[in-house]
Amino acid sequence: MPFSSEQFTTKLNTLEDSQESISSASKWLLLQYRDAPKVAEMWKEYMLRPSVNTRRKLLGLYLMNHVVQQAKGQKIIQFQDSFGKVAAEVLGRINQEFPRDLKKKLSRVVNILKERNIFSKQVVNDIERSLKTESSPVEALVLPQKLKDFAKDYEKLVKMHHNVCAMKMRFDKSSDELDPSSSVYEENFKTISKIGNMAKDIINESILKRESGIHKLQSTLDDEKRHLDEEQNMLSEIEFVLSAKDPSRLNKNVDEDNIIPTYEVGDGDDDDDDGDNDDDDDDDDDDKNYDDRSNDSNYGVTNISTTDKKNEVVEKTDSEHKNSTHNPSDNQFGMKRTHDMIGHDDANDIPEKKVHLDSKTSEDGTFNSEDGHYELDIEGHVGAQTDEGVENSGGVSSSIQDLLSKLAN
């Protein structure tokens, strides 16, 4: 029967800590003596797997010990040579992984191999040398108590897991062999039920331990997260203090303070003052506009008053003109008075004023003086007049001059 690596791995995974189980697997391997080198290499590869637990590796060690001893008794030297080439490396590695109680069992196996001269002296010396190497640095680490508790539970979980797998395989095999047509079907079913109940108990116990281990790991993880946050806060505080106390940064801040201009404290907000100034300017403009309107209104009133006065002058002139036609003797007096008034007005620097009445000759009532020229057009003022009215035009001129003098004053 040819050697099968899958079948060999299955036998290693199903080994139990009993003489019967180990002897059965050993007999099968002895039949594969032609493939002894392959068996030794597969055994080495299995024993060095990280996924294989220490208990399963211890059972593999027991199997190797049984095979080489039986091979020596049967003078099958192939297994001694093949396992002798890999024994030192494998035993040295698993010794670092084993806990203290398993290390004692490993040492007892090595002593048996040495006493019975299963391997050559060179192989035995190599094995002893590998066992004297320093233990794994993991054992020297200081672990939290929660992790230590989890490690203890984990060892139990590993053992229970293999028991669970073995019980499940046993239950599956028994259920496959159950034949309903058999006369002993009920008895076989009772046996299978017992195996199933045993498997259920082992699985439930394993589940409880795993839940407890997960809780411990989660608690440890929460503690580590809290410590991580605290350390990050400390790091931020240190960086802030170093940045604030940096001499180059302090000098830079001093220079910036010197550059920044200083301002005197005011009574109020500048914006409010500007608004007040704007309001004052608006008030001034309103006052100015009001004054202008007042002046305009006064000017209008003055013009109205002047117009009224002119109308009064015209009415008075007409009246006096009518009177002057009846009192021709007043013409000379009026002419003389007018002349005197004109001289008086010149002395007071009264502006020159001309009233054009479009008279033609001095005979028609035109009066000429050195400083002023007044012309009276009787015909334009009162219409067509008689000759008598023309002769008395001097009186009208005198009255007009008198009124003009009053207006000038």
From Swiss-Prot:
Swiss-Prot/TrEMBL keywords: DNA-binding, Nucleus, Transcription, Transcription regulation
Q: SMART domains annotated for this entry?
A: RPR
Keyword Cytoplasm recorded: no
A GO cellular-component term linked to this record = site of double-strand break
User: Which PROSITE patterns does the UniProt record give?
Assistant: CID
Biological process terms in GO annotation: mRNA 3'-end processing; transposable element silencing
Q: What else is known?
A: Present with 3930 molecules/cell in log phase SD medium.
Q: What does this protein do?
A: Involved in transcription termination by RNA polymerase II and in regulation of Ty1 transposition.
Q: What is this protein called?
A: Regulator of Ty1 transposition protein 103
Q: What is the protein's species of origin? A: Saccharomyces cerevisiae (strain ATCC 204508 / S288c)
Q: Which gene encodes it?
A: RTT103
